[in-house]
Swiss-Prot record:
Protein family membership: Belongs to the mannitol dehydrogenase family.
Reactions the enzyme catalyzes: D-mannitol 1-phosphate + NAD(+) = beta-D-fructose 6-phosphate + NADH + H(+)
Alphabetical GO biological process terms: mannitol catabolic process
Alphabetic keyword roster: NAD, Oxidoreductase
Record's protein name: Mannitol-1-phosphate 5-dehydrogenase
Amino acid sequence: MKALHFGAGNIGRGFIGKLLADAGIELTFADVNQTVLDALNARHSYQVHVVGENEQVDTVSGVNAVSSIGDEVVDLIAEVDVVTTAVGPVALERIAPAIAKGLAQRKAQGTERPLNIIACENMVRGTTQLKGHVFNALAEEDKAWVEAHIGFVDSAVDRIVPPSASATHDPLEVTVETFSEWIVDKTQFKGALPTIPGMELTDNLMAFVERKLFTLNTGHAITAYLGKLAGHQTIRDAILDKKIRAVVQGAMEESGAVLIKRYAFDPQKHAAYIQKILGRFENPYLKDDVERVGRQPLRKLSAGDRLIKPLLGTLEYGLPHRNLVKGIAAAMHFRSEDDPQAQELAALIADKGPQAALAQISGLDAASDVVAEAVNDYNAEK
C-alpha cells in the first residue's frame, strides 16, 4: 500500500505520517519546505519524541519526500492508494490543483483501483471542503469518473504537538503528546476499508467532531481565559489551580450532558474521556501558553464555536450551564497586545457595554437570562 501525505510539518511528521509509516505503508511526504524535503530524502527517517507519563523516542523510517508544487507529486497521486493532508485549513485550496491534475492523469492511465483522500485538519468536514476545491480545478469531463473512483473521506483529528522542547536544530525532530485520535467517516470510502492502527472508523463522525469541540476545545479555552485572569502563564499552571479546575471540569460536564442527550454517549465513558482531557492539560511537557490558547476570542465566542455552541445545547435541552457561563464571562475579559481580536473585543465592550457586545458576538438575545448571567459574572471579575 502506498500513501502520499501533504504537509511535512510537525503534525504531518508527528501524527498522521507516523501512523501511516508505522502501519507499514510506503509513505512519501509532499511539502514546499526544501530544507525538510532534503533532510527526509537524505535520511529517509526521523525521530519523534512522545511525551507523557513515560517519555519515549520513536524512529519513523522508510519515508521519502517530493515538492508539493512539482510534477512528481502529480505522478504520485496517479499511483498511490491513500492521500492525506495536514497543511492547515487555508492551504487546502492551494494543493487542490495538483490533486486535480493527478486524478486526471489517473483516469487517463485507465487506473480503476480506488483512491481515498483524507484531509486531517483542525476543522469540520475538511475533506468535503477540499473536494470542492479539487472539483473547481477539474475539467468537466473528468468529474463523473472522479466521483465514481475517488473517496473523499472526512475525519476528526486530535493530538497536541507543542514546540520542540529539546535543544536541537534537527529540522525533522518533533515532539508529540502520548494521546492521539484520528476518526474517519467510514461511509465515504471507495473500495475496501483500510486497516491502519490508530485510525478509528465511524458512521457517525459529527458526534466525535462535537465531542472534541465540546470537551477538549471548550475546556482548553476556559482554562486559558480563567488562567489569564488569575495570572497563570501556562495551561498546566492554570488547571492545577483548584478553583479553575472545578469550573473547567464543571463546564465539560455541562457540555457533556448535551452530548449524552444528543448522541446517546455512554455517561461513564464520557466521564472517563473528560478525565483524560484534564490529564492532557496537566502534561508538564506541553508548555502551552494561556495567551496562545486564548487568542481569537471573537471567533471562540461565536455561535458555532467552543463556548456558545455547547451553551445553546444546554438551553435546547433545559440543562445546567453555570460553569459554561463563567467561562464565557472570562473570555470577555481576555486582553492581549499581540491579538487583534482581543483588542477588537475590548473596544466593542467599551463602546457598547458587555450586554450588547456579547449579544452581537455570540448571536444570543441581549434580553435573555443567560446574557444577564454572563454580564453579572463579567462585572464580578472587574
